[in-house]
UniProtKB/Swiss-Prot annotation:
Lineage: Eukaryota, Metazoa, Cnidaria, Anthozoa, Hexacorallia
Name this protein carries in UniProt: Eukaryotic translation initiation factor 3 subunit L
Function: Component of the eukaryotic translation initiation factor 3 (eIF-3) complex, which is involved in protein synthesis of a specialized repertoire of mRNAs and, together with other initiation factors, stimulates binding of mRNA and methionyl-tRNAi to the 40S ribosome. The eIF-3 complex specifically targets and initiates translation of a subset of mRNAs involved in cell proliferation.
GO biological process: formation of cytoplasmic translation initiation complex; translational initiation
Record keyword Protein biosynthesis present: yes
Every PCI domain range: 296-502
UniProt subcellular location: Cytoplasm
Protein species of origin: Nematostella vectensis
Region of interest (Disordered), residue spans: 1-21
Biased composition (Acidic residues): 1-19
Similarity comment: family membership: Belongs to the eIF-3 subunit L family.
Length: 525
C-alpha cells in the first residue's frame, strides 16, 4: 500500500484540496486486485476531467501525471487492467477505451506484449475509432493535440510491430503460428488504411487545407465534424500517418501524394507538435531520396535538422519523446550524408557543422564510393519496412520480416552502383574546360564506347525533378544538380563550371545579428 505522502502530483496544483476527498461515482470494490489508493485518486481525477472536457487538466495529466506515476510504480510492470479500473469510473466505456490506449501503449513501450495483448490493443483501437467515426454527430470528447498525434503514431507503430512479429516464424511455437494463421485479419493493412482515410474524409481536412493555403476560412468547408478540434486534428495527423504507412510499404509516390495539400514550408497551427513535424520531414525526405529527388531530400532534412537544433532545449522537457527524436536526428544526418554524396549541395552553416561533427569519417568513405558504408548508413537510417500481406504460414519456418527491407536495400544499392563513377568523372571534369573523349577515357582505363555511356549516365543522373513552389510535393521543374556541366561536340567534351560562388557576406551578417541579439539579452539581465 502507498502512504499519504505519495500524493498524486502530476495534475493541477490544487488537486489535493479539490479532489482528495472525492470518492468517485462507482463502487471501489475491484475484485482480487487491490488498486493502490494513489492510483484510485488519479483515475477519479482523470475521469472527472475527461467528463468535464477540461483540456488544460487532461493535457497536464497526459504529459506529466501519467508518466510520473508510470516511472514511480509501473516502470517494469503493466498498469492495472481495465476490468479493475471499471468500478472506479462507473463502467464509463469511453474512458476505459482511452485508459486501455495508454495501458497497451505502456506495455509496448516498457514490456514485451504477448500475442493476446497485441490482439486486444487492436480491438481497443477499433472500439476507439468506431466511437469517433460511426456517429451522426460529433462525439463529446476533448483531447490534447499531443495525445491525438500519439494515438495515430502509436496505431501505425503497433501495426508495424505486429507485421514484423508475425513475419518472424523461425523458433515460434506451433500453437502460436496456428493462432496467427487463424487471425490473419487482425492488424490487416486494409483496416489500418481504412481508418486513416476515413478520418481524413470525416474531417474534410483536405478541403480545409486547400482553403487555408489560399488564405480563406477553413471553417467554411469544414462541415459538422471538421470544425471540431478532435476531428480536424485527427484528420491532419492521419495524413501524416498515411505518409508514414505508404513509406513503410515502399510506395513513395503515394506517400508524397497524400500530402498534396500540406504546405511544408509554412508554419501553421498543424505543425506545433514537434514529433509530428519531425516525423513528417523524415518520411518526406526519405521518400524523395528513394525517388532520386536528392535536392528535395536535402532541403527537407536540412530544414528539420535546423528545427531540432533550435528547439532542442524545449524538446528535452518532454523526456518520453526526447530519445526517439534524437535517434531520428542521427538517422537524418546519415541520410543527409548519403544525399550530399550523390548530389553535392551547399548547406546551412549550422547543419553543415553538425554534419561534419557527426559524419566526417562516413562522408569520406561515401565519397570514395564505399558500397559497404552506403549499405550501413541506409540500414541504420531507413524505416522498418513491412509487407502488406501475412507470410506463408505453411512454408518452412523462416524470418520473412527482412524481405521488405532487403527489397528496398537492393533498389537503393542498384541506384548507388549506377552512380559509382559519377564522383570520379566529376573530379576530372573540374580540371578542364575542354578534353577529348578518348583522352579522358584513357585516364579512367575505359574504352571510348563505355566512357560515352558513363557520360550519358552522368547527364541523366544529375538532372532531377526539383520542387519550386506550391503545396504538391510531386510537382517540380527539371534542374541540373551538378556544379559541373558539359556538352559533347563530335569527339570533344566542352566543360562549364556552374558552381555559384559562396556568398560569405550573408554568413557574416547572420553571425553579426546573432551576436547583436546575444548582447541585447545580456544587457537585459
Amino acid at each position: 500500500m502507498y502512504t499519504q505522502a505519495d500524493e498524486y502530483d502530476g495534475g493541477d496544483a490544487g488537486y489535493e484540496d479539490d479532489y482528495s476527498g472525492y470518492q468517485g461515482d462507482g463502487d471501489d470494490s475491484v475484485g482480487s486486485y487491490n488498486v493502490p489508493e494513489e492510483i484510485k485518486r488519479f483515475i477519479h481525477f482523470f475521469h472527472q476531467h475527461v467528463l468535464e472536457q477540461n483540456l488544460y487538466e487532461i493535457q497536464s495529466i497526459y504529459e506529466n501525471g501519467f508518466n510520473k506515476l508510470t516511472d514511480r510504480y509501473f516502470n517494469k510492470t503493466p498498469w492495472p487492467e481495465a476490468e479493475f479500473i471499471a468500478p472506479l469510473v462507473s463502467g464509463d466505456q469511453v474512458f476505459l477505451i482511452l485508459y486501455k490506449e495508454l495501458y497497451y501503449r505502456h506495455i509496448y513501450n516498457k514490456l514485451k506484449p504477448t500475442v493476446e495483448q497485441r490482439f486486444e490493443s487492436y480491438y481497443n483501437y477499433c472500439d476507439l475509432f468506431n466511437y469517433i467515426l460511426n456517429t451522426d454527430e460529433p462525439v463529446p470528447l476533448t483531447l490534447p493535440n499531443q495525445w491525438l498525434w500519439d494515438i495515430i503514431d502509436e496505431f501505425i507503430y503497433q501495426f508495424q510491430a505486429f507485421s514484423q512479429f508475425r513475419s518472424k516464424l523461425q523458433n515460434k511455437p506451433e500453437d502460436e503460428i496456428d493462432v496467427l494463421r487463424a487471425n490473419s485479419k487482425i492488424w490487416n493493412i486494409h483496416s489500418v488504411l481504412n481508418v486513416l482515410y476515413s478520418l481524413v474524409e470525416k474531417s474534410r481536412i483536405n478541403y480545409q487545407l486547400e482553403m487555408y493555403n489560399t488564405n480563406g476560412n477553413p471553417d467554411e468547408v469544414s462541415g459538422e465534424f471538421g470544425i471540431h478540434p478532435l476531428y480536424k486534428m485527427l484528420g491532419y495527423f492521419s495524413l501524416i500517418g498515411l505518409l508514414r504507412l505508404h513509406s513503410l510499404l515502399g510506395d513513395y509516390f503515394q506517400a508524397i501524394k497524400v500530402l498534396s495539400n500540406v504546405e511544408l514550408t509554412r508554419n501553421t497551427m498543424y505543425s506545433r507538435i514537434p514529433a509530428c513535424q519531425i516525423t513528417t520531414y523524415y518520411y518526406v525526405g526519405f521518400a524523395y531520396l528513394m525517388m532520386r529527388r536528392y535536392q528535395d531530400a536535402i532541403r527537407c532534412f536540412s530544414s528539420v535538422l535546423l528545427y531540432i537544433q533550435r528547439t532542442k532545449n524545449m524538446l528535452q522537457t518532454k523526456s518520453y519523446q526526447y530519445e526517439e527524436i534524437m535517434k531520428k536526428n542521427d538517422q537524418m544526418y546519415n541520410l543527409l550524408a548519403i544525399a550530399l554524396t550523390l548530389c553535392p549541395q551547399q548547406l546551412d552553416e549550422n547543419v553543415h557543422s553538425q554534419l561534419r561533427e557527426k559524419c566526417t569519417e562516413k562522408m569520406q568513405k561515401l565519397q570514395k564510393g564505399d558500397l559497404q558504408m552506403f549499405e550501413e548508413c541506409f540500414s541504420y537510417s531507413c524505416p522498418k519496412f513491412v509487407s502488406p500481406v501475412p507470410p506463408n504460414f505453411d512454408a518452412p519456418p523462416a524470418n520473412y520480416n527482412r524481405e521488405p527491407f532487403n527489397l528496398q536495400l537492393k533498389v537503393f544499392m542498384n541506384e548507388v552502383a549506377q552512380q559509382s563513377m559519377i564522383p570520379v568523372i566529376r573530379s576530372y571534369l573540374k580540371l578542364y574546360t575542354t578534353m577529348p573523349i578518348a583522352k579522358l577515357a584513357a585516364f579512367l582505363d575505359m574504352d571510348e564506347a563505355t566512357f560515352r555511356n558513363q557520360l550519358l549516365c552522368y547527364k541523366h543522373k544529375q538532372r532531377n525533378l526539383v520542387w519550386t513552389k506550391g503545396t504538391d510535393g510531386l510537382d517540380g521543374e527539371q534542374q541540373s544538380s551538378s556544379e559541373v556541366d558539359f556538352y559533347i561536340d563530335r569527339d570533344m567534351i566542352h566543360i562549364a563550371d556552374t558552381k555559384v560562388d559562396r556568398r560569405y557576406g550573408e554568413f557574416f551578417m547572420r553571425q553579426i545579428y546573432k551576436f547583436d541579439e546575444m548582447a541585447r539579452n545580456l544587457q537585459a539581465l
